[in-house]
């Protein structure tokens, strides 16, 4: 097993962190070599197997990401924008593949990630699942085929704990729709309607976000015209689809040169 890539999972106590740990541990193509958590977390210094309620596996949770990254060939990161930006500088130093599923980045954050990608392989996507990335491609094709008589709305739903909106996946879908129409999303995006808004502006791409319960992730792209509607839909029922995609990205990046990649590159779409 020592000849397979070593993976570090950041934010191991979170919902995605736990799923990533389970996915890596269950894979014959990778091995778990590190888990990080924020300073002061109860798990610091504990064996991750014990922290998760099982037997020790010889991997200690640390609050020193550079130490953890130094032993890894890839880092899988579903944390916060601030943490991910800090991690990007360290993965570049460690020459480890950095797989980023974090969302909610500011333009300044993205600039930092682009700078880090000059020295490291960074695979970043708002969604790591095959189904969603196929949906992105379909959205672009449908948007290109239909004119502005078809109003485009992106509707997404997630669990009550999600802190950013629209979701990274919704923005991916919006970007795809805008690309299909040959426009910039920033010029046509409508992210909030409240009160007397007036009529819908022709050509706009609207976003709606739902938060509640334990919804893993649901995304609809609606093309609505007079007399007919087309809906493209993806429903994730289990976070394992994201974890499997992230691990696939980590393995795919092993023989790639420094640069910024996404799941379309990983999946060859």
Curated annotation (Swiss-Prot):
Q: Give binding positions for NADP(+).
A: 38
Documented EC number(s) = 1.17.1.8
Cited InterPro entries = DapB_C (IPR022663), DapB_N (IPR000846), DapB_N_CS (IPR022664), DHDPR_bac (IPR023940), NAD(P)-bd_dom_sf (IPR036291)
Q: What residues does NAD(+) bind to?
A: 11-16, 37, 101-103, 125-128
Q: Which UniProt keywords apply?
A: Amino-acid biosynthesis, Cytoplasm, Diaminopimelate biosynthesis, Lysine biosynthesis, NAD, NADP, Oxidoreductase
**CDD domains recorded for this chain?**
DHDPR_N (cd02274)
Tell me, which GO biological process terms does this entry list?
Answer: diaminopimelate biosynthetic process; lysine biosynthetic process via diaminopimelate
A cellular component term, taken from the record's GO annotations? cytosol
**What positions constitute the catalytic site?**
158, 162
Q: Which domain of life is it from?
A: Bacteria
- One Pfam family this chain carries? DapB_C
Q: Does the keyword NADP apply?
A: yes
Q: Sum up the protein's function in the record's words.
A: Catalyzes the conversion of 4-hydroxy-tetrahydrodipicolinate (HTPA) to tetrahydrodipicolinate.
Q: Which family does it belong to?
A: Belongs to the DapB family.
| PANTHER family listed in its UniProt record | 4-HYDROXY-TETRAHYDRODIPICOLINATE REDUCTASE 1, CHLOROPLASTIC-RELATED, DIHYDRODIPICOLINATE REDUCTASE
Q: What is this protein called?
A: 4-hydroxy-tetrahydrodipicolinate reductase
Origin species, per record, is Dinoroseobacter shibae (strain DSM 16493 / NCIMB 14021 / DFL 12)
């Amino acid at each position: 097993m020592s000849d397979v890539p070593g993976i570090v999972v950041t934010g191991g106590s979170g919902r995605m962190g736990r799923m990533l740990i389970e996915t890596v541990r269950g894979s014959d193509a990778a091995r778990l070599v590190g888990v990080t958590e924020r300073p002061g977390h109860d798990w610091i210094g504990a064996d991750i197997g014990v922290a998760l309620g099982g037997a020790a596996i010889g991997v200690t949770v640390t609050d020193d990401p550079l130490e953890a990254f130094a032993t890894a060939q890839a880092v899988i990161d579903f944390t916060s924008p601030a943490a991910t930006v800090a991690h990007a500088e360290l993965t570049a130093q460690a020459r480890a593949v950095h797989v980023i599923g974090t969302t909610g980045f500011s333009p300044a954050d993205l600039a930092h990630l682009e700078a880090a990608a000059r020295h490291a392989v960074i695979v970043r996507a708002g969604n790591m699942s095959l189904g969603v990335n196929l949906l992105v491609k379909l959205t672009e094709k449908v948007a290109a085929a239909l004119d502005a008589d078809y109003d485009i709305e992106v509707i997404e739903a997630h669990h009550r704990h999600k802190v950013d909106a629209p979701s990274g996946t919704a923005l991916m879908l919006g970007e795809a729709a805008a690309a299909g129409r040959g426009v910039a999303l920033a010029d046509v995006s409508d992210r909030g309607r409240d009160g007397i808004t007036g009529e819908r502006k022709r050509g706009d791409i609207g976003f709606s976000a739902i938060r509640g319960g334990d919804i893993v992730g649901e995304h609809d792209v609606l093309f609505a015209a007079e007399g007919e509607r087309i809906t493209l839909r993806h429903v994730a029922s289990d976070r394992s689809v994201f974890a499997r995609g992230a691990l696939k990205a980590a393995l795919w990046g092993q023989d790639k040169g420094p640069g910024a990649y996404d799941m379309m590159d990983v999946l060859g779409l």
